[in-house]
Amino acid sequence: MLRSNDVHCTPVILSTPEQTPTHRLGSYYLETGYGIRASKVTYDRKNSAITEFDFDTIDLKGLLEHFTWLHLSGITPALAPNCRKLTMECLKTARELGLTVSFDGNFRSTLWTWEEARDFCTQCLPYVDVLLGIEPYHLWRDEEDHSKGDVKDGIPFQPSYEQQDEIFQAFIDRYPNLRCIARHVRYAH
C-alpha cells in the first residue's frame, strides 16, 4: 500500500513474516466524533498474533544491524507482557549496535494502567536518544526516597514553556543519553 501511494519506504524489510495461523490480526476501530461528541477508539488486540507471538525466534541483531535509527512506540509494550519484553530487547540491541533510538510513550488507557505505563516506560529511558513527550515517565526528585515526589508533581496538564524547560532539563540531567526531547502540544477548543 505504501509503495502504491508513492510513499518512500526504503529500506523496509519485505521478507515473508512469521506465520501465526491460529491467531488473528489485531485491529482498532475509530468512531469519528461529531459536534461536541469526541472521537472514540476501540482496540481489539487481545489474543491477536502480536500478543501471542514467540519473539525469541527473531534474530534482533540480524534484523537491526543494517539500520541507523529505531523508533518505538509505547503502544506495543502495552499490548502484552511478551511485547514489553520485545520492546526492551529492541532497545538494548539497538543501543549495543549504536543505533539512534527514538521513543514515544503513546499512553493508551484502554491498553494498560497509568502506573504500568510509567514503570515500564521509565525503564526504557536509559536506552533512548530522542524522547517524544514527557509522559508517562517517572522523574523522581530522589531515586532512593520516592515520597519526595515526582519533579512533575504540581505541574499543570498544560504547563507553561518555562515549566516544560524545567522538566526537560531534569530529564536530561537524569538521563544524559537523551539528545533531544520533543513534547506534543495539542489544544482542544
Identify the meaning behind each predicted range.
Residues 1-74:
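Conserved N-terminal subdomain of the carbohydrate kinase-like
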Residues 3, 92-96, 125:
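Anion (oxyanion) recognition and catalysis
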Residues 9, 101-102, 132:
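Hydrophobic beta-strand scaffold residues
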Residues 14-16, 74, 105, 135-136, ...:
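Short secondary-structure boundary segments
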Residues 58, 84-89, 114-122:
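Charged helix-capping and loop-helix junction motifs
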Residues 97, 111-189:
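Conserved phosphate/ATP/ADP-binding segment of small-molecule kinases
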Residues 97-105:
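Short beta-strand/loop segments at the ligand-binding rim of alpha/beta enzyme cores
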Residues 105-111:
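A short, histidine- and acid-enriched strand-loop-helix "catalytic/donor-clamping" loop
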